[in-house]
């Protein structure tokens, strides 16, 4: 079997296992959601926040090109670390579905679809998909670590030169 096929197969196995773990949630807990009485009928404007101290490490990438006529897309798994005072910048998921598993810590999400901040804790999972914007912050004194799996075009992949070391 060619080496590149073995690597892809191994990467695919890891990705499938991790996506399954995220979907099931290691503890079966879904992350806190916007309280029903705080869900907005129409998105409101939220602050545009810049990246503050986020460390990213791409764990594996699966090239989905040609699979079920999906186009030129990749399934990417990353570990993101939000240091104390850190911010994951304002971003959207209109065309980038994502699953997140919180490994360590507590993050606060600010969403254009919710009237109040949403708290996410270790052991919970969350889905990110739809026409809204959000940003996350770490207001604690320890790192927040999460695993994110998303579907992206090649130009959304992280620059390996800026990837966090193992």
Enumerate the predicted regions with their spans.
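Glycine- and acidic-residue-biased ligand/ion/polar-headgroup-sensing regions
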Residues: 95-114
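Short histidine-centered beta-strand/loop micro-motifs
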Residues: 88-93, 111, 118, 137-139
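A short, N-terminal "cap"/entry segment at the start of jelly-roll beta-barrel domains
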Residues: 2-4, 28-76, 117-119, 126, ...
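Bacterial N-terminal signal peptides
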Residues: 11-25
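Short acidic-glycine-tyrosine-enriched beta hairpin
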Residues: 82, 113-131
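A short beta-loop-beta micro-motif enriched in histidine and acidic residues
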Residues: 70-73, 86-99
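Ligand-binding loop in jelly-roll beta-barrel domains
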Residues: 121, 130-156
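Bacterial Sec-dependent N-terminal signal peptides
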Residues: 2-14
């Amino acid at each position: 079997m060619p080496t590149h096929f073995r690597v892809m197969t191994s990467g695919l196995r890891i990705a499938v296992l991790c996506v399954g773990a995220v979907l099931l949630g290691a503890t079966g807990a879904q992350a806190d959601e916007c309280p029903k009485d705080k869900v907005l009928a129409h998105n409101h404007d939220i602050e545009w926040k810049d990246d503050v101290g986020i460390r990213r490490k791409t764990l594996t990438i699966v090239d989905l090109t040609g699979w079920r006529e999906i186009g030129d897309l990749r399934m990417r798994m990353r570990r993101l670390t939000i240091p104390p005072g850190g911010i994951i910048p304002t971003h959207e998921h209109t065309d980038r579905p994502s699953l997140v598993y919180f490994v360590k810590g507590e993050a606060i999400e600010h969403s254009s679809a919710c009237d109040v901040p949403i708290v996410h804790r270790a052991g919970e999972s969350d889905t990110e998909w739809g026409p809204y914007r959000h940003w996350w912050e770490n207001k604690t004194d320890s790192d927040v670590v999460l695993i994110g799996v998303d579907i992206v075009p090649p130009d959304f992949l992280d620059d390996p030169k800026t990837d966090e070391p193992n």
